[in-house]
């Protein structure tokens, strides 16, 4: 006679939650972003390039009222609201997150978004209108900070994961429709 289920699922039967990994990646990106911005503001002369590798890679301190890589300048309050929505959405999604790769990608986006939000809320000219500190210049690319490539890299990772069939709420690749019917 088979045993009746007790109604509780053993911890090893449940897929692992990845919120801790997501938050660790986000905290690392956020800390790097804040520390590098504080150092840039303290040590770099505004608008004057400091060569690192010739004229190709320089430290160049600028204040950016736009989005990543100086896009959407002049829409600071809209960008602040969008970034706040992204942060809230990632926290909401994080409760159901199972995939470690999605945790890394979302953590990169969360850390970068929060890094730039810190500037938007606490830097001049004022809350919701603060300008983001950018200081890395590579070739012809717009000046950026640690948060910008983190957000872009995290987004690229999520697109690649989606293309190859990895969902945020499963451990591996999703099964094809014909395999799941067997």
Curated annotation (Swiss-Prot):
Localization per record: Cell membrane
Catalytic activity, EC: 3.4.23.36
Residues that span the membrane, as ranges: 21-41, 74-94, 98-118, 146-166
A GO term, aspect molecular function: aspartic-type endopeptidase activity
Pathway(s) this gene product operates in, as recorded in its UniProt entry: Protein modification; lipoprotein biosynthesis (signal peptide cleavage)
GO CC entries: plasma membrane
Physiological role: This protein specifically catalyzes the removal of signal peptides from prolipoproteins.
Protein's recorded name: Lipoprotein signal peptidase
Source organism of the structure: Mycobacterium avium (strain 104)
The encoding gene: lspA
């Amino acid at each position: 006679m088979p045993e009746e289920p007790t109604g509780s699922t053993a911890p090893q039967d449940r897929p692992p939650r990845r919120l801790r990994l997501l938050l660790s990646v986000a905290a690392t990106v956020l800390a790097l972003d804040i520390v590098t911005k504080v150092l840039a503001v303290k040590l770099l002369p505004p608008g004057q390039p400091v060569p690192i590798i010739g004229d190709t890679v320089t430290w160049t301190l600028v204040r950016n009222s736009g989005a990543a890589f100086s896009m959407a300048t002049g829409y600071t309050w809209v960008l602040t609201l969008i970034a706040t929505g992204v942060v809230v959405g990632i926290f909401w999604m994080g409760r159901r997150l199972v995939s470690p790769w999605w945790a890394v990608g979302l953590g990169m986006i969360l850390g970068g978004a929060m890094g730039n939000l810190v500037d938007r809320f606490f830097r001049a000219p004022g809350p919701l209108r603060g300008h983001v500190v950018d200081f890395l210049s590579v070739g012809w690319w717009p000046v950026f900070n640690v948060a910008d490539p983190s957000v872009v890299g995290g987004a690229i990772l999520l697109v690649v994961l989606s293309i190859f069939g990895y969902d945020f709420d499963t451990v591996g690749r999703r099964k094809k429709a014909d395999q799941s019917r067997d």
